[in-house]
Amino acid sequence: MLTVEFTIEPFVEGDPGAHVTAAVAAVEAHGIAVDFGPFGSLFSVNEKSLPIVIGDLLRVAYENGATFVNIAVSRFNS
């Protein structure tokens, strides 16, 4: 499994905005739980699904007004 951490700008204090909530919903539509946080969010995904899920996250974020998306993907061996 891979861990994906992401932030989406612009930051809107007190309300994450559609550019964030729609992107989170796009990930959740794949049956993936998102740990939503004020300074970044994360989820776990398998390697096969990674490009599809990331693609949907980016597409929906920018369709809804994102100006910048930062994504970090990590593999943690147990």
Positions of predicted regions on the chain:
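Charge-rich, low-complexity N-terminal segments
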Residues: 1-78
